[in-house]
Amino acid sequence: MVAVHAVGVFCGSSVPGDPRYRDAARVLGDLIARRKVTLVYGGGSTGLMGELADAALARGGRVIGVIPAGLFAREVGHTGLTELREVTSMHERKKLMYDLSDAFVALPGGLGTLEELAEVATWSQLGLHSKPVVLLDVDGFWEPLVAQLDRMAGAGLLKPANRNLIQRTRSADEALDVIAAARPAGRKKWITAEER
């Protein structure tokens, strides 16, 4: 089992039209706090980011936000967090969130969320970490991505073991249970000539 003290959550800073996404963010934030796990996220106070952080804070949870200085005003940096760390770039934000987190959950979001998810999954594929990476699939939001991952694996462009680096869950409870039950993977880092 993986010792989980902090979970990094990727999600949108926009306000979605579907209230189920907001509800899922609130439920996840609340559950992370109830399980006495630190929430690490992008530091915004709007959209799903704000819902997530506010729910964790309302439950008395520890919340660390990581936000680039240039986005502080645009994403309306959350000033009520346990800790808000300003960084100089998006890359530094992702690296610090990675360093602070023992696992990752992706809620619905836009291109930034997709990019953060892809980067931590790629780092796992390269053998740089074995931290769990989980999709919280709210009402089928991530179905097209799951289908694309399956298509890439079926086409031989993604090894089956690497396809399974991103796990799909359908509730906050399931996401955190999958993370808690995860075992560090002892994977090969590279494809051999025989496997080509």
Q: Residue ranges of each PLM-predicted region?
A:
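Flexible, glycine/proline-enriched loop segments at strand-loop-helix junctions
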Residues: 107-108, 132-136, 163-166
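Active-site/ligand-binding-proximal alpha/beta "capping" segment
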Residues: 92-127, 134, 185-191
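Short acidic/polar capping segments at secondary-structure boundaries
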Residues: 110-112, 126-128, 139-141, 172-173
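A cross-family phosphate/adenosyl-ligand binding-site feature
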Residues: 1-100, 138-178, 182-196
